[in-house]
């Protein structure tokens, strides 16, 4: 056993790695459950949208309402799971920092450096996945809570029995919802166009750079390009002189008549 390996064992490297692998396994399980919870929120949001459109149509056409729309969950399990995952990510970050200090104090080998980099990559992947799922769930919950407020408006309408202002509010809500969907489509198209233009710009820049490098590497080609440019300039001057002479000849001919 090498001296570097002994130093790593004495500094607790293997113990830290075991703890890191355990937390990584726990994170994998909890992130999977968290993603399934996000999928349930997606289904709930879709049901709310469909129910909202059905209720709105009934109110505007016949005045009949059915308030049996689904409710938004309390979110306790969602919030608890989110806090657990956040805590595990912070612990894994601390362990990775400890592993880095441990490896640095014992002259790490290539194998140790690769293992440390792998643990960092896993932490980065889990962090990005957690942020993505969290953002989706928050967005869906906000959307669902907004749509669930329609039930309150409908209940007030049934209690009052009047067509205004409840119906007007529902109409405005439907108009706003349609406008938001249209704006989202326009923004998506603009982002796609921007990405295409950016890729084309990068492609043209690469081509220009390659041509320049080719000219620098091969003087013969650079000289040939220069000759073509000079010939083009000479042809342009000759053509300009011919046009000027013809114009002058026409002016003299017109004045002499």
UniProtKB/Swiss-Prot annotation:
TM region(s), chain numbering: 236-256
Membrane topology, Vesicular segments: 257
Keyword Phosphoprotein assigned: yes
Compartment(s): Golgi apparatus membrane; Endoplasmic reticulum membrane
Cytoplasmic compartment residues: 1-235
Keyword Endoplasmic reticulum: yes
Key words of the record: Coiled coil, Endoplasmic reticulum, ER-Golgi transport, Golgi apparatus, Membrane, Phosphoprotein, Protein transport, Transmembrane, Transmembrane helix, Transport
Coiled-coil boundaries: 113-147
InterPro entries given in the database record: Golgi_SNAP_su1
One Gene Ontology cellular component: cis-Golgi network
GO process annotations (BP): endoplasmic reticulum to Golgi vesicle-mediated transport; protein transport
Pfam entry (one): V-SNARE_C
Topology of this chain in the membrane: Single-pass type IV membrane protein
Domain of life the protein comes from: Eukaryota
Subunit annotation: Component of several multiprotein Golgi SNARE complexes.
Family affiliation: Belongs to the GOSR1 family.
Cited function: Involved in transport from the ER to the Golgi apparatus as well as in intra-Golgi transport. It belongs to a super-family of proteins called t-SNAREs or soluble NSF (N-ethylmaleimide-sensitive factor) attachment protein receptor.
Name assigned to this protein: Golgi SNAP receptor complex member 1-2
Gene source species: Arabidopsis thaliana
Gene: GOS12
């Amino acid at each position: 056993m090498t001296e570097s390996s002994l130093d790593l064992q004495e500094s607790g490297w293997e113990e830290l790695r075991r703890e890191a692998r355990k937390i990584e396994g726990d994170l994998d399980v909890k992130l999977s459950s968290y993603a399934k919870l996000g999928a349930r929120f997606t289904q709930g949001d879709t049901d709310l949208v469909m129910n909202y459109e059905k209720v709105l149509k009934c109110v505007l056409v016949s005045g009949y309402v059915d308030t049996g729309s689904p409710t938004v969950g309390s979110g306790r399990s969602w919030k608890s799971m989110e806090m657990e995952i956040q805590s595990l990510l912070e612990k894994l970050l601390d362990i990775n920092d400890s592993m880095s200090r441990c490896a640095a104090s014992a002259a790490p080998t290539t194998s140790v450096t690769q293992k440390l980099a792998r643990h960092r990559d896993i932490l980065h992947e889990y962090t990005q996945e957690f942020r993505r799922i969290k953002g989706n769930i928050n967005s869906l919950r906000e959307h669902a809570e907004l749509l669930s407020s329609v039930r309150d408006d409908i209940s007030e309408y049934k209690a009052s029995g009047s067509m205004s202002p409840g119906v007007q509010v529902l109409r405005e809500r439907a108009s706003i919802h349609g406008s938001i969907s249209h704006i989202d489509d326009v923004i998506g198209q603009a982002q796609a166009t921007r990405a295409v233009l950016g890729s084309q710009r990068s492609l043209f820049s690469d081509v220009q750079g390659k041509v320049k490098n080719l000219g620098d590497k091969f003087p013969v080609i650079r000289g040939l390009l220069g000759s073509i440019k000079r010939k083009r300039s000479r042809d342009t001057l000759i053509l300009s002189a011919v046009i000027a002479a013809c114009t002058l000849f026409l002016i003299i001919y017109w004045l002499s008549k």
